[in-house]
Amino acid sequence: LKQSYHEFYRIYGTDTYEDKVSPETIITEDSNSGYQFFEHVCIENGLKCESMNGKSNVFHYLNKHKGEKILVIADGAAFGSEIDRVLQVIHGRKNVALYLPESFEWMIMDADILKNNTVRSILSNPSEYVESKLYFSWERFFTAILIEQTKDTYLAYAKRKLNPAYLSGAIKESILRKMNIIDLNKKDE
């Protein structure tokens, strides 16, 4: 039995989603680069975006906002301890979807923006590359890889403040395209 660490980005909710997921609100569990990216996308598209400033706040937000069409974006690498509570609070609700990539850094690398064979190899089998003594979590591992692979380039990555290059047309679209059935485009009014 082989564990797979890069497939936990499927969309979770009451049902399996086959049609487009079109949220009105996006909530992210963090307030760093991932939130900054989605906040920018939401502003462009007239959607609401909020940071939960921590994974444990997702449950409380969903409990208070039962009528909104919400997409939760959280690092699958770190969200495991909250998944049971969150699935219980969204049980029976068709207006909430969970998108749980390994991390925002993983999303960037998975979008193949870097066109880097080392990154491709790491993503295809991360357990062959990670040293658990060095990295407390998969998120930290993927962050370290992205920082290392982009240093001294126009895509230089920093966790706390998103490089504006990631908000530009083709790069932004490459990241969003990996989200398959999630539609974050402007809503017709």
Which functions belong to the PLM regions below?
Residues 5, 9-12, 17, 35, ...:
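Sequence-level detector for tyrosine residue identity
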Residues 4, 22, 31-33, 51, ...:
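Generic serine detector
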Residues 73-153:
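Activity-critical C-terminal alpha-helical subdomain
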Residues 127-189:
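Charge-biased C-terminal accessory regions appended to nucleic-acid-, cytoskeletal NTPase
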Residues 38-42, 87-90, 179:
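Hydrophobic, Leu/Ile/Phe/Ala-enriched alpha-helical segments that form helix-helix packing faces
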Residues 2, 20, 48, 55, ...:
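Context-gated lysine
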Residues 15, 19, 30, 75, ...:
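Acidic-enriched, low-complexity/disordered segments with a strong bias for Aspartate over Glutamate
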Residues 1-81:
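RecA-like P-loop NTPase motor core
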